[in-house]
Amino acid sequence: MNFTKLFAIVLLAALVLLGQTEAGGLKKLGKKLEGVGKRVFKASEKALPVAVGIKALGK
């Protein structure tokens, strides 16, 4: 059996099968990071007036 041809076929099949899952995983990770960023932003909006103190009360 020709090892080079077999290796090329296995490599091609792996690229086809695993190439699509790579993009899906990265998309899920990006969505999770986006959600974390939104939560941090909202929490900082709530905490900032407390940290500023008197200036947040209308002065």
From Swiss-Prot:
Q: Which domain of life is it from?
A: Eukaryota
Look up keyword Oxidoreductase and say if it applies: no
Q: What is its main location?
A: secreted
Record-linked InterPro entries: Cecropin (IPR000875), Cecropin_insect (IPR020400)
Where is the protein situated, by its record's location annotation? Answer: Secreted
Pfam families, per database record: Cecropin
UniProt entry keywords in alphabetical sequence: Antibiotic, Antimicrobial, Immunity, Innate immunity, Secreted, Signal
Signal peptide (UniProt feature, chain positions): 1-23
Instruction: Establish whether keyword NAD is in the entry.
Output: no
Stated family: Belongs to the cecropin family.
Function description: Cecropins have lytic and antibacterial activity against several Gram-positive and Gram-negative bacteria.
Mind telling me what this protein is named? Cecropin-A1
UniProt gene name: CECA1
